[in-house]
UniProtKB/Swiss-Prot annotation:
GO terms for molecular function: metal ion binding; oxidoreductase activity, acting on NAD(P)H, heme protein as acceptor. Keywords: Cell membrane, Heme biosynthesis, Iron, Membrane, Metal-binding, Oxidoreductase, Transmembrane, Transmembrane helix. Heme binds at residues 274, 335. This is Heme A synthase. Interacts with CtaB. The keyword Methyltransferase does not apply. It is a multi-pass membrane protein.
Length: 367
C-alpha cells in the first residue's frame, strides 16, 4: 500500500512539474503578445497624432502587406488618397514625398496588427495540438483570437468613416477601436496573470476584489474618454491647468443641443470630462492604497496598491505636461503608453485577488 501511494504521489508530482513548464511557456508567449499589442497601440497613437490614418484608402488584408515598390505604384496610391475629403480640403498642396510620410505610419500599424494575428494564432494551434493548454483556457484563448479578427473589421469600419464626407475618422469609431484593443490586452494579461504563481497573503478587506475591479473598469473608461479627446482634437481646447482658461467649470460646456451631445461631440466638454475622470481615478487608487496599507501592510496586495497609485500619479503628471505643451507627438505617445501601463497593471492587480489557476491535482509539489 505504501509503495502504491508513493508511486501515485510521484506520478502526480511529475504531472505538476510538467504543468508548471507548460505554464511558463504560455506566460512567455502571452508576454510577447502583450509587448506586441503595446507597440501596436503606440503606433496607432502615432498614426492618429500625425493625421496619417486615412492615407491608405483600401482594405487589403493579404495584398496590403506589400507597400508600393515603384514610382508608378506610389503615384497610384497617392491618386487614391487625392479622392478623399481630407486631401481635397486640408492637404491639397501635399506632394508624393510628403504623402509617403503619413503612408508609412498607417502601413506599419496595419502590418503590426497582422503580425500579432500570426504570433497569437500559430502558437495557440501548436500549444493546443501538443496538449500544453489546460482545458479551462482553450476557449478563452480562442475568444481572444476572435476578438482580434473582429478588431480588424472595426479598424476598417473606423477608417471608412473618413473616406466620403468627413476629413477625419469618427471619434466614436476611434474610441471603439481603442477600447477593443484594450479588451484584447486585458484578456491576455488576465490569463497570463492567472498562470503566474501567487502569494497566499490575505486580501486587505472583503471589498478589495470589487474595488480592484472598479479601478480597472474605470481606467478603461478613462481610456475611452481619452480616445474621444484624440478624435476631436480636444487636447487643444484648453491648454491651461489646473483651471480651464481661468475657470474651474468653463461656461461653454453645454452649448450644443441636445445638451447630452456635448459629452461626445463638444471638444471642450470632452476634455473637461476627461480631466474629471483623471481626478476620480487618482482618488480611487489613493483610497485603495490607504485601505491596503492600513489593513494589510507588507503584503503583496499593499505593494501592488502602492505601485498602482504611483503609476496613476505619474500618468496624471504626464497628461498635465502634454496638455500644457499643446500635445507634442512624443508627449502624446508617452501619455497613451502610460494609459495602457496603468490599465494593464490595474487588470493584473484585479486578477491577483483570484489566485493562480488551480493545478490539475490536489497534491502540491514539496521541496
Amino acid at each position: 500500500m505504501a509503495v502504491a501511494n508513493l508511486t501515485t504521489e510521484q506520478a502526480i508530482l511529475t504531472e505538476v512539474r510538467k504543468q508548471n513548464r507548460n505554464r511558463r511557456a504560455l506566460r512567455l508567449w502571452l508576454g510577447f503578445v502583450l509587448l506586441a499589442l503595446f507597440c501596436l497601440v503606440l503606433v496607432g497613437g502615432a498614426t492618429r497624432l500625425t493625421n496619417s490614418g486615412l492615407s491608405i484608402t483600401e482594405w487589403k488584408p493579404i495584398h496590403g502587406v506589400i507597400p508600393p515598390l515603384s514610382a508608378a505604384e506610389w503615384d497610384e496610391e497617392f491618386r487614391l488618397y487625392q479622392r478623399i475629403p481630407e486631401f481635397q480640403q486640408l492637404n491639397s498642396a501635399m506632394t508624393v514625398d510628403e504623402f509617403k510620410g503619413i503612408f508609412w505610419w498607417e502601413w506599419a500599424h496595419r502590418l503590426i496588427a497582422r503580425g500579432i494575428g500570426v504570433i497569437f494564432a500559430l502558437p495557440l494551434i501548436f500549444f493546443w495540438l501538443t496538449g500544453r493548454i489546460e482545458k479551462r483556457l482553450r476557449w478563452p484563448l480562442v475568444g481572444i483570437l476572435a476578438l482580434g479578427g473582429l478588431q480588424g473589421f472595426i479598424g476598417w469600419w473606423m477608417v471608412s468613416s473618413g473616406l466620403s464626407v468627413r476629413t477625419d475618422v469618427s471619434q466614436y469609431r476611434l474610441a471603439t477601436h481603442l477600447v477593443m484593443a484594450c479588451l484584447i490586452f486585458a484578456g491576455c494579461m488576465w490569463i497570463m496573470r492567472g498562470l503566474s504563481p501567487h502569494s497566499n497573503d490575505p486580501a486587505p478587506a472583503r471589498s478589495s476584489r470589487g474595488f480592484a475591479a472598479a479601478i480597472a473598469i474605470f481606467a478603461l473608461f478613462q481610456i475611452y474618454l481619452g480616445a474621444l479627446v484624440a478624435g476631436l482634437d480636444a487636447g487643444f481646447s484648453y491648454n491651461t491647468w489646473p483651471l480651464m482658461d481661468g475657470a474651474v467649470i468653463p461656461s461653454d460646456l453645454l452649448i450644443q443641443q441636445p445638451f447630452w451631445i456635448n459629452a461626445f461631440e463638444n471638444p471642450k466638454t470632452v476634455q473637461f470630462i476627461h480631466r474629471i475622470g483623471a481626478y476620480t481615478l487618482f482618488a480611487l487608487t489613493l483610497i485603495n492604497m490607504v485601505i491596503a496599507l492600513r489593513a494589510a501592510p507588507w503584503t503583496t496586495h499593499a505593494r501592488r496598491a502602492v505601485v498602482l497609485f504611483s503609476l496613476v500619479t505619474l500618468q496624471a503628471a504626464i497628461g498635465i505636461a502634454t496638455l500644457l505643451m499643446q500635445v507634442p507627438l512624443h508627449w502624446g505617445l508617452l501619455h497613451q503608453a502610460g494609459a495602457l501601463v496603468v490599465f494593464g497593471f490595474a487588470v493584473a492587480n484585479w486578477r491577483g485577488f483570484y489566485g493562480e489557476y488551480p493545478h490539475a491535482t490536489a497534491i502540491a509539489e514539496r521541496d
